[in-house]
Design a protein with these regions (language model features):
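Conserved N-terminal substructure of TIR/SEFIR domains
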Residues: 1-59, 146-187
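Cross-kingdom TIR/SEFIR domain
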Residues: 23-32, 36, 46-133
Length: 187
């Protein structure tokens, strides 16, 4: 019997809107299956409520912004205590000292994203790879697995595509003539 893919999204207050980016990215994966996306209740969650939502998740996406805020710290600690599979993601252009220390103490390296498009690509690729479980836990058909392969290759190509930022003289530059000028000071 096919299992439901259960995902928990924890986020600091400044990245609350990115939860929706993750939901949309997952909805666009080209296969039909049962996926449950969970989060902490928005108003004064208890430890028990957080524990209940994280306890049997297949993946925890943790989004760290410029500062670590409640209840994100408890979500993080609970996910590790329950030995959940955590993917630490950060968008911290100006991290506070507390956020810097929080990042430093992570048992895994952080994946950086700078905008919603990058976050969606990272999560889509990760979920697609989770769905390709060797035991086919999620009951995908051969045609769906093939679609996932094509989807993963496309996302990998996007990841490897060079930035469109100007480089060299495209972004402005200075040309220096290094040829000797023998007749400059002749009278």
């Amino acid at each position: 019997m096919a299992e439901t893919l259960r995902i928990f999204v924890g986020a600091t207050r400044d990245l609350e809107a990115e939860r929706g980016v993750i939901g949309k990215a997952i909805a666009e994966i080209p296969v039909q299956l049962a996926i449950e996306i969970r989060r902490t209740p928005p108003l004064l969650p208890t430890y028990e409520e957080i524990f209940e939502r994280i306890a049997n998740c297949d993946r925890v996406y943790f989004l760290l912004g410029n500062d670590i805020t409640a209840p994100a710290g408890l979500e993080w600690a609970t996910a590790w205590r329950l030995e959940r599979s955590v993917l630490p993601l950060r968008c911290s252009p100006r991290p506070t000292p507390a956020a810097q220390e929080f990042q430093r103490l992570s048992p895994l390296p952080w994946l950086d994203f700078h905008n919603a498009t990058e976050l969606a690509r990272i999560v889509s690729l990760d979920v697609a790879r989770l769905l390709k479980h060797p035991a086919n836990r999620y009951g995908l058909l051969v045609a769906e697995l093939e679609r996932l392969d094509v989807y993963i290759r496309r996302l990998d190509r996007l990841q490897m595509a060079p930035d469109k930022a100007p480089s060299g003289a495209e972004g402005g530059g200075v040309l220096i003539d290094s040829r000797p000028r023998s007749h400059e000071n002749e009278t």
